[in-house]
């Protein structure tokens, strides 16, 4: 029997869902979601926002974690076997409030419909300004791991967005479209365009982390990526089929076995 191993996540449901395909000897020790690395460009600046309407503990935790910059101070100090980092939530962009504070434009925060947010400056993912903030924040995150002696446990996940559906799921997808229209040709065409545009924007972010910061990276080829029409979180270009998560886990296993690769 293998010794118990632990993983900490800085990223999205993509990494979180992939951990379900790890062996039973793995435990999820930490999950820092909805927290753009771009906000790490500025130190902790708690904005004066009314968060009382956040209904779930998860919503409260991720929004407060974003404001507190929890990923940069908790993960470098956490005794885990691997820190898995994905950049999916960078797509959300960030908001600069009137006082200069940076917060991630998460669905939880936007859903509060606060006047401080509606009048704030939005810094969109993919713009030069967002990328410049990301470079500073990502560098701080990696530096914190390096200073704690845990940077070799950091692995970046590079898995492209997709609108491709596996052969076994295509008939099911047609049935779902006939039932409720959620997977209509128009919807799937939009997903394909969004996936292509977003993947192009992500390339310089991935290159910076992999090449400039020297972080070990798992790349999942597009031919191994497919979405799941019946994914528990719904139809989206980053809600993958089981085979994609298995490919992620295989890459993670190789990266752990050879941390210098």
Show which residues each predicted segment covers.
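Substrate-gating cap/lid alpha-helix
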Residues: 166-219
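Catalytic nucleophile-elbow at a beta strand-turn-alpha helix junction centered on a G-D-S/GDSL motif
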Residues: 5-60, 83, 88-89
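Surface-exposed cleft-lining segments at the edges of enzyme active sites
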Residues: 110-141, 187-196, 236
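Histidine-centered active-site loop/cap adjacent to the catalytic His
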Residues: 232-261
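Hydrophobic, aromatic-enriched interface-forming segments
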Residues: 120-178
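Oxyanion-hole/transition-state-stabilizing segment in secreted/luminal serine hydrolases
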Residues: 61-129, 161-169
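Acidic carboxylate-rich catalytic motifs and surrounding loops in phosphoryl-/glycosyl-chemistry enzymes
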Residues: 156-160, 214-231
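Short catalytic/ligand-binding loop motif for oxyanion handling, primarily in non-cytosolic enzymes
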Residues: 15-19, 40, 91-96, 162-168, ...
């Amino acid at each position: 029997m293998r010794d118990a191993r632990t993983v900490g996540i800085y990223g999205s449901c993509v990494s979180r869902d992939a951990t379900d395909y790890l062996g039973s000897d793995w435990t999820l020790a930490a999950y820092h979601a909805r927290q753009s690395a771009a906000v790490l460009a500025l130190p902790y600046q708690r904005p004066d926002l009314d968060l009382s309407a956040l209904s779930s503990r998860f919503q409260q935790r991720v929004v407060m974690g974003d404001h507190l910059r929890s990923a940069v101070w908790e993960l470098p100090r956490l005794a885990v076997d691997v820190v898995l980092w994905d950049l999916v939530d960078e797509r959300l962009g960030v908001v600069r409030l009137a006082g200069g504070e940076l917060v991630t434009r998460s669905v939880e925060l936007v859903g509060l419909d606060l006047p401080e947010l509606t009048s704030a400056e939005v810094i969109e993912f993919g713009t030069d300004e967002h990328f410049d903030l990301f470079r500073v924040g990502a560098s701080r995150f990696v530096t914190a791991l390096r200073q704690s002696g845990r940077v070799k446990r950091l692995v970046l996940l590079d898995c492209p967005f997709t609108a491709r559906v596996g052969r076994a799921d295509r008939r099911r997808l047609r049935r779902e479209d006939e039932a409720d229209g959620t997977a209509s040709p128009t919807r799937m065409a939009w997903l394909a365009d969004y996936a292509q545009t977003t993947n192009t924007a992500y390339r310089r972010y991935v290159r910076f982390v992999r090449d400039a910061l020297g972080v070990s990276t798992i790349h999942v080829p597009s031919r191994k990526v497919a979405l799941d029409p019946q994914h528990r979180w719904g139809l989206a270009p980053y809600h993958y089929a089981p085979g994609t998560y298995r490919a992620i886990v295989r890459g993670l296993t190789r990266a752990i076995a050879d941390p210098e690769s």
